[in-house]
From Swiss-Prot:
One of its GO terms (biological process) is translation. It comes from the Bacteria. GO terms for molecular function: rRNA binding; structural constituent of ribosome; tRNA binding. Belongs to the universal ribosomal protein uL16 family. Part of the 50S ribosomal subunit. This is Large ribosomal subunit protein uL16. It comes from Rhodopseudomonas palustris (strain BisB18).
Length: 137
C-alpha cells in the first residue's frame, strides 16, 4: 500500500476539495489515461485495487504510471467510544483528487486493451472517470 515514509505532522485537517486540477491534468508519460471527473478522496487501498485490475487485464504487458499519491492521513476513533477526548489515531491514507486530474496512465498496449483495462480500474474507484488518449502526433 502507498503511504509517505515520513510526514511533518501525524494528523491533518479534513479540508475541502475546491476547483479543478491545473497540474496533472494532461497525459505526461503514456498514450492512454484515466481522468477524474469529480472531486473525491481516493484511499491507498482503492488505488492498489485499481492498479491490480489494470495490470491483470494488460497481462503485465506495457507500462503503468500512477499519477496520484495518498499523502493525507485520515484519523478514526474506535467503535463505541464517547465523543471528545481528542482526535482519533490515523487509520488510512488518502489522495485528494480534483476534477480533471489524470489518475492512471498506460502505454505499450493497443487502444482496445487500454480502454477495457482502464474501465476495469475505474470500477474500483469511488469516482466518475473518463478514458483519455493522446492525440496522434
Amino acid at each position: 500500500m502507498m503511504q509517505p515514509k515520513k510526514t511533518k505532522f501525524r494528523k491533518a485537517h479534513k479540508g475541502r476539495i475546491h476547483g479543478v486540477a491545473t497540474s496533472g491534468a494532461t497525459l505526461s508519460f503514456g498514450q492512454f489515461g484515466l481522468k477524474a471527473m469529480a472531486p473525491e478522496r481516493i484511499t491507498a487501498r482503492q488505488i492498489e485495487a485499481a492498479r491490480r485490475a489494470l495490470t491483470r487485464h494488460m497481462k503485465r504487458a506495457g507500462r503503468v504510471w500512477i499519477r496520484i499519491f495518498p499523502d493525507l492521513p485520515v484519523s478514526k476513533k474506535p467503535a463505541e467510544v464517547r465523543m471528545g477526548s481528542g482526535k482519533g489515531t490515523p487509520e488510512l491514507w488518502v489522495a485528494r483528487v480534483k476534477p480533471g486530474r489524470v489518475i492512471f496512465e498506460i502505454d505499450g498496449v493497443n487502444v482496445q486493451v487500454a480502454k477495457e483495462a482502464l474501465t476495469l480500474a475505474a470500477a474500483k474507484l469511488p469516482i466518475k472517470t473518463r478514458f483519455v488518449a493522446r492525440i496522434a502526433e
